[in-house]
Amino acid sequence: MTYTGKSIKRLNDDKFITGRSNYIDDIKIPSLYAGFVRSPYPHAIIKRIDATDALKVNGIVAVFSGKDINPMLKGGVGVLSAYVNPSLFRFKERKAFPEDNKVKYVGEPVAIVIGQDKYAVRDAIDRVNVEYEQLKPVIKMEDAEKDEVIVHDELKTNVSYKIPFKAGDIEKAFSQADKVVKVEAINERLIPNPMEPRGILSVYDGNSLSVWYSTQVPHFARSEFARIFGIPETKIRVAMPDVGGAFGSKVHIMAEELAVIASSILLRRPVRWTATRSEEMLASEARSNVFTGEVAVKKDGTVLGIKGKLLLDLGAYLTLTAGIQPTIIPVMIPGPYKVRDLEIESTAVYTTTPPITMYRGASRPEATYIIERIMSTVADELGLDDVTIRERNLIDQLPYTNPFGLRYDTGDYIRVFKDGVAKLEYNELRKWAQQERSKGHRVGVGLAFYLEICSFGPWEYGEIKVDNKGNVLVITGTTPHGQGTETAIAQIVADALQIPIEKIRVVWGDTDIVEGSFGTYGSRSLTIGGSAALKVAERVLDKMKRAAASYFNADVQEIRYENEEFSVKNDPSKKASWDEIASLATTKEPIVEKIYYENDVTFPYGVHVAVVEVDDLGMARVVEYRAYDDIGKVINPALAEAQIHGGGVQGVGQALYEKAIINENGQLSVTYADYYVPTAVEAPRFISYFADKSHPSNYPTGTKGVGEAALIVGPAAIIRAIEDAVGARFTKTPTPPEEIYKAIMSKK
């Protein structure tokens, strides 16, 4: 049986649907519980912390603050240098508590309370008395850029990063323009909402440190813990149990995790902490940027040049991946289009708000929203339709190096765009919408095209072990946490070894078992991790063939292998099963192969269409979402389609509902009463296809990545659909009902 290309059911779902999963809170190790005293102010000096009353609470073991924990740390959390050049940013590594005794956002931890049960800890938190001297906050990016209120005194400015991205001759492009079109694209601050909040359990025995951690990057976490705490990596184990979602937010190491580990070291006792939903919403936020610019165009819709300013909010601290936004968004703004002349000033600033982290798409949604806003706005200004403007500007030959040096790999953008428009029946939907509007029904259809960068390297680890019964253990450096990647990897290995998938087990996420790992994020897992597994499977099969040759006393070139059976080409009577050769081979030496597989990034792309209804009060609802994607070779169509559906629902959230509301006093609403996340009720009907003539990547798997596609392009398609329904221009995600209502009323 061939497994690749088939919708094989996920291999590990039984434990999740029967309640046998094992999350951080399920780990049965007797431990102390931690909780945090947090700042009620966005900007203030800590004058005094008095834990006297808290320590009187029955069951409370300790209360630690910065003076107790920060001196233990050899460093703090910095930036992910694999993708971000730290020298380009002004920043200070973040320790467990503010080193300057100055809080910089509402909810910043100022002390950790340790107790025998979580309820005592919650009581004690309220009895820690903290005296503050309030300072003036700076909430808006535009105000922070003025440097009138400085967030980090030692940096002497709020501007962490300011780089002009220039390509071609922008002045020449604008001098040749028939028209200059102004464009604005706003991505509001939003909050990743995995079902399981962050959690950690730290055990220190005086010699070694064991950490169970809800993370996407266990090996990176181990390296950082070793650096920060001065403990050799060989003495640290980081284990990733089942993780209830992440969406990029669990790539980060936050201050709370450092405090929990430090407390377990100080007390020589296990300490655990799981964030409440409010704490999760305070700690993990994303997006928050504004693009304002001008576009030079010809009358026929040809885009000659783009210039503008990208202003990004970092929040109070530069987190591990926040630096990706100001560096990747500008270079991805050209997208799949031929524009060669650009000048984008990218500026990232600190504000007294919760730090910005990573969220599904991580810079690609912003870049896509900007370039698709440009295309749609130019189309409106020139009286062109959305199909014509894109066809006129799409890259027509690949591979292609974009103006900032990114090499787009394989594909046919124009053909896939045309095929997608036809397959998704976009033109037919437009006619239907016009007919419905003539009847008084406010409906709209929006289209957007995307190109994303995926499969970030620089490498991924793969290892395979074959036991004496022929069973195969695949050890992957990827870290699945809901995507089903382990099933797809098993499919790849089963086909490579020509054995039943039931003989394969895939493991990940434990630094004591997995030699190396970069983790799961950026739609990289199946492409680079699956390719590592495929290459190492080929090595294993070669070793098994050599074992068979030895058994048959034949040359290895004479060995034929097919459907679990080894035989000699010129003597078919000599044959043995996979299991038999495995049994013989492992008596002498184990069958083990490993690889650190390296390759370059990939660029999947596609066209998505949204259909919306808008009522008289401005409430928009996405009723149908259609997708046509070229993601290279599709290993498991059901898993790939599930990623489109999940990303599409999150795209609905970003386009219509999700905005972290921070008032002028820095107070953030941290409940679902104020932060709306789409549920199954708001989910649209999905129709999704993968390109009839796909273009495989240069990876052994031929895959490109699909995990973020729909959230990358969805907001642009949905906002365009609202514009079609209402007949007005909108610039931001989310576009709230009150703005839609104002536009409706202005038409009357």
Swiss-Prot record:
Q: What is catalyzed by this enzyme?
A: D-glyceraldehyde + A + H2O = (R)-glycerate + AH2 + H(+)
Functional pH dependence: Optimum pH is 6.7. At pH 6.7, glyceraldehyde is the predominant substrate, however at pH 7.5 the dehydrogenase exhibits activity preferentially towards the aliphatic aldehydes such as formaldehyde, acetaldehyde and propionaldehyde.
Q: Which UniProt keywords apply?
A: Cytoplasm, Metal-binding, Molybdenum, Oxidoreductase
Transmembrane segments annotated in the record for this chain = none
* Pfam families assigned to the protein according to its UniProt record, in alphabetical order: Ald_Xan_dh_C, MoCoBD_1, MoCoBD_2
Q: What is its EC number?
A: 1.2.99.8
Tell me which InterPro entries the record gives: Ald_Oxase/Xan_DH_a/b, Ald_Oxase/Xan_DH_a/b_sf, Ald_Oxase/xanthine_DH-like, AldOxase/xan_DH_MoCoBD1, AldOxase/xan_DH_MoCoBD2, AldOxase/xan_DH_Mopterin-bd_sf, Glyceraldehyde_dh-related
Q: Which Gene3D superfamilies match?
A: Aldehyde oxidase/xanthine dehydrogenase, a/b hammerhead, Aldehyde oxidase/xanthine dehydrogenase, molybdopterin binding domain
Q: Which GO terms describe its molecular function?
A: glyceraldehyde oxidoreductase activity; iron ion binding; molybdopterin cofactor binding; oxidoreductase activity, acting on the aldehyde or oxo group of donors
**GO CC terms:** cytoplasm
Give cofactor(s), names only: Mo-molybdopterin guanine dinucleotide
Q: Where is the signal peptide?
A: none
Location comes to:
Cytoplasm
Which PANTHER family does the entry link to?
Answer: ALDEHYDE OXIDASE 1-RELATED, XANTHINE DEHYDROGENASE
Assembly and interactions?
A: Heterotrimer composed of a large chain (CutA), a medium chain (CutB) and a small chain (CutC).
Entry protein name: Glyceraldehyde dehydrogenase large chain
Organism from which the protein derives = Sulfolobus acidocaldarius (strain ATCC 33909 / DSM 639 / JCM 8929 / NBRC 15157 / NCIMB 11770)
